[in-house]
Swiss-Prot record:
SMART domains: EFP (SM01185), Elong-fact-P_C (SM00841). Pathway: Protein biosynthesis; polypeptide chain elongation. CDD domains: S1_EF-P_repeat_1 (cd04470), S1_EF-P_repeat_2 (cd05794). GO terms for biological process: peptide biosynthetic process. InterPro entries: Elong-fact-P_C, NA-bd_OB-fold, Rib_uL2_dom2, Transl_elong_fac_P/YeiP, Transl_elong_KOW-like, Transl_elong_P/YeiP_cen, Transl_elong_P/YeiP_CS, Transl_elongation_fac_P. It comes from Amoebophilus asiaticus (strain 5a2). This is Elongation factor P. It is found in: Cytoplasm. Involved in peptide bond synthesis. Stimulates efficient translation and peptide-bond synthesis on native or reconstituted 70S ribosomes in vitro. Probably functions indirectly by altering the affinity of the ribosome for aminoacyl-tRNA, thus increasing their reactivity as acceptors for peptidyl transferase. SUPFAM superfamilies: Nucleic acid-binding proteins (SSF50249), Translation proteins SH3-like domain (SSF50104). Disulfide bonds: none annotated.
């Protein structure tokens, strides 16, 4: 058990029969009345973010979450297949269990979350950035880099995103997994 004074970003709590992580919190002491804590909570089961206010000093049940690194092996009709690199134990996941499945490619590592007391699977977390190869995009015009113009590009996983005009086919680009947006071109050693 913890109280609202123990709140910190990333803390996992049990609230309304669900598991949540604290995304943001603010301790408020108004001039009149008791203190309270405003929070933004993200559900670990469905990814929804809710706002909630706790009275100061309220006891909250914390949840212990275990993170394990798994390697993505392959995808087939049954779902996504991952392997624990330490024990070589395989885990089969439904497509809904991965937040953005088009951002992962074979051999990539993911963090898999388990509830420590029950051992139940909670979810997957992608790394903040991934590097993917551009398989198709229209050719850009030479010298047209002064503006922030974008064009569509198809990546090796089938994902389509907007990239700057200077990106060509077979280039590797870095993508932010939180916003699913182009970040930069990856420099390759030739």
């Amino acid at each position: 058990m913890a109280t609202t004074s123990d709140f910190r970003n990333g803390l996992c709590i049990e609230f309304n029969n669900d598991l949540y992580t604290i995304v943001e919190f603010q301790h408020v002491k108004p001039g009149k009345g008791g203190a309270f804590v405003r929070t933004k909570l993200k559900s670990l089961t469905n990814g929804k973010v809710i706002d909630n206010t706790f009275n100061s000093g309220v006891k909250i049940t914390t949840a212990r979450i275990e993170r394990k690194t798994y390697q993505f092996l392959y995808k087939d009709g049954a779902g996504y297949h991952l392997m624990d690199n330490n024990t070589f134990e395989q885990l089969d996941l439904d497509e809904k269990a991965i937040q953005n499945p088009l951002l992962i490619k074979e051999g990539q590592e993911l963090d898999v979350l388990f509830h420590q007391e029950t051992g139940n699977f909670i979810g997957c977390e992608l790394p903040p950035f991934v590097e993917l190869k551009v398989t198709y995009t229209e050719p850009g015009l030479k010298g047209d880099t002064a503006t922030r113009a974008l064009k569509p590009a198809t990546l090796e996983t089938g994902l389509q995103i907007q990239v700057p005009l200077f990106i060509d086919n077979d280039e590797i680009i870095k993508i932010d997994t939180r916003t699913i947006a182009y970040v930069e071109r990856v420099k390759t050693d030739i």
